[in-house]
Regions:
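Short glycine-rich anion-binding loops that position phosphate/pyrophosphate groups of nucleotides
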Residues: 9, 29-32
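Anion (oxyanion) recognition and catalysis
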Residues: 2, 17, 80
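Catalytic subdomain that performs nucleotidyl-dependent activation
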Residues: 23-24, 31-105
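C-terminal helical/coil "lid" or tail adjacent to the Rossmann-like core of SAM-dependent
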Residues: 99-114, 120
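Short, small-residue-biased leader/transition segments that mark boundaries at the very start
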Residues: 1-8
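Glycine-rich phosphate-binding loop signature in dinucleotide/nucleotide-binding domains
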Residues: 15-21
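Divalent metal-coordination and catalytic microenvironments
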Residues: 12, 79, 120
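A short, charged, Gly/Pro-tolerant segment at domain boundaries
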Residues: 97, 115-130
Length: 130
């Protein structure tokens, strides 16, 4: 599962249970899932990705990712059309993380990166059975 840090996810889940909120929605999109897939292949040797729904702590918390099927560019287009301000990424590691390295690697493919991202996520979904 992909979370910024173990400690922050534990805090998020503990707080959600304390507030009697048993579903937590993350804003991961299809491009996040594709990068996670490639990271798992490169650094863990596994064909795995983010799942749309995952249950933690014997059902106490369910994480959902309602945007997981949408490419980032579609979400950006919608947000701008709706008048939402641009938001910078909030990863504490920023540009020095493995995720940033994999993003930079994919950008090297230029106009082909969109199809590569789509193929990565589709392959992982099929391998994981969803």
């Amino acid at each position: 599962h992909s979370f910024p840090t173990r400690r922050s996810s534990d805090l998020l889940f503990t707080t959600s249970v304390d507030l009697d909120c048993h579903k937590v929605a993350f804003g991961h999109h299809a491009d996040d899932a594709a990068v996670t897939t490639l990271m798992n292949l490169m650094f863990n040797g596994k064909l795995e990705t983010m799942v749309p729904r995952v249950v933690f702590f014997d059902g106490a918390v369910t994480v959902i990712r309602p945007l997981i099927t949408l490419p980032e560019k579609e979400l950006i287009r919608y947000a701008r059309a709706a008048g939402y301000p641009d938001q910078p990424a909030s990863c504490p590691q920023g540009e020095t993380s493995r995720r940033a390295e994999v993003e930079a690697f994919l950008r090297q493919f230029g106009c082909r990166q969109e199809q590569i991202r789509t193929n990565l996520w589709r392959a992982a979904r099929e391998a994981m059975g969803f």
